[in-house]
């Protein structure tokens, strides 16, 4: 999957663990299967925007916190 999906998935996992929430608990709150949430976290499938907002709400964070990806350093010519 894309680098963006992978990074968003990492953010979901990080915040879920900070909240001491299990995959099962997050899945139940957002009405998705445990398998689907696991795939989101592993970047195997993209998260649609509506689900991203539901996840952010379940984790009690701003959706922007899930969208943060470290900047990539481009090799620009001198």
Name each model feature, range by range:
Residues 12, 26-27, 37-40, 66:
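Conserved hydrophobic/aromatic packing and binding residues within compact polymer-binding modules
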Residues 31-45:
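Recognition helix of helix-turn-helix/homeodomain-like DNA-binding domains
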């Amino acid at each position: 999957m894309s680098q963006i999906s992978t990074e968003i998935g990492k953010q979901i996992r990080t915040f879920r663990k900070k909240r001491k929430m299990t995959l099962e608990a997050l899945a139940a709150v957002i009405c998705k299967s445990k398998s689907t949430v696991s795939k989101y976290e592993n970047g195997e499938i993209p998260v649609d925007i509506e689900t991203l907002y539901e996840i952010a709400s379940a984790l009690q964070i701003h959706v922007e916190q899930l969208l943060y990806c470290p900047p990539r350093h481009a090799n620009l010519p001198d």
